[in-house]
Amino acid sequence: MGAMCYMVEIHVVNTKEDLRAALDLRVEVFVDEQKIPVCDEVDHLDNIGAILDGKVIHVVAISNLQIVGTARIIFDVPEDEYPHIGRVAVKRIMRDNQIGRSIMNKLHQILKEKGCQGATLSAQLEVKDFYIKLGYVQRGKTYMDVGILHQDMDYIF
């Protein structure tokens, strides 16, 4: 059976309610599904203060008034590094519906509008090909993070 087509809108998070819903989805995907400890999943950038300070932008994908995907861009990085995309998550029943691609396109649009030259991310090995299809290039060797193999990847605009 082919993937269904869903109307999805990607919004920048600017309320505590949307941030809470994004974090709930991340816990569902990373903690419940992948068994990552919650203390490794939620960090100091997951609050409205970090958003207001410009350290991070969170986005949510909304379909039928439900948050079905989320991700964030970290701008609080060393001066010689690109902003870091992370915590890309899509609700299990909504995968294979281009939602991840829509989220990444929105993140790239945000970065371009801010004058950034590229982005970096740490991909779980099992979804590395998703990022390669978007134009990301592998950097360095694979490594373990929270018990899962990862690969650093870069995207140049």
Residue ranges and their predicted role:
Residues 60, 65-75, 82-84, 89:
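Conserved beta-strand in the GNAT
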Residues 122, 132, 137-152:
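Conserved catalytic-core motifs of GNAT/GCN5-like acyltransferases
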Residues 90, 96-109:
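Conserved acetyl-CoA-binding loop-helix of GNAT-fold acetyltransferases
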Residues 104, 111-124:
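Conserved GNAT acetyl-CoA-binding A-motif
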